[in-house]
Amino acid sequence: MGLFNISLLLTCLMVLAIFHSCEAQNSPQDYLAVHNDARAQVGVGPMSWDANLASRAQNYANSRAGDCNLIHSGAGENLAKGGGDFTGRAAVQLWVSERPDYNYATNQCVGGKMCGHYTQVVWRNSVRLGCGRARCNNGWWFISCNYDPVGNWVGERPY
């Protein structure tokens, strides 16, 4: 009986550790840290967390859970989706990975590549951030981050 209890306890601890490691990548600080690191690299000030934006982002992520399609809501936002343990941190890193595809001198994406997620991350006038994450019906994760003030205005440089 004692061995069974120890096995059960170890199993519970492993499940909690896995859950914690997954959730540990989705806190407001996780979203902010990657945003603010990217912003600091180009001399842009840090963002702060906004609970109202986070609530809107979470509501929108929840509404997309049925199909997991990356359809914009019309708010100033970045969207991402991924399988497995796709985290908020991973989503922001994905957006920041577009940096080499942005040419500051021409204020354009290089070679027709996508770079608008990156420019929103570093948009100098966007100073508040709120993000949400929802599990889609297909098992993937849908992540939405909202920015205020809205950025990514055509023809304007992000910083």
Curated annotation (Swiss-Prot):
SMART domains to which the protein is assigned, alphabetical: SCP (SM00198)
Cellular component aspect of the GO annotation: extracellular space
Disulphides: C68-C136, C109-C115, C131-C145
Induction context: Upon infection by virulent and avirulent races of pathogens, for example fungal pathogen C.fulvum.
Keywords: Disulfide bond, Pathogenesis-related protein, Plant defense, Pyrrolidone carboxylic acid, Signal
GO BP term, pick one: defense response
Segments forming domain SCP: 32-147
Domain of life: Eukaryota
Modification Pyrrolidone carboxylic acid, positions: Q25
Signal peptide from the UniProt entry: 1-24
Keyword Transcription: no
Role, per record: Probably involved in the defense reaction of plants against pathogens.
Family: Belongs to the CRISP family.
Name of this chain's protein: Pathogenesis-related leaf protein 4
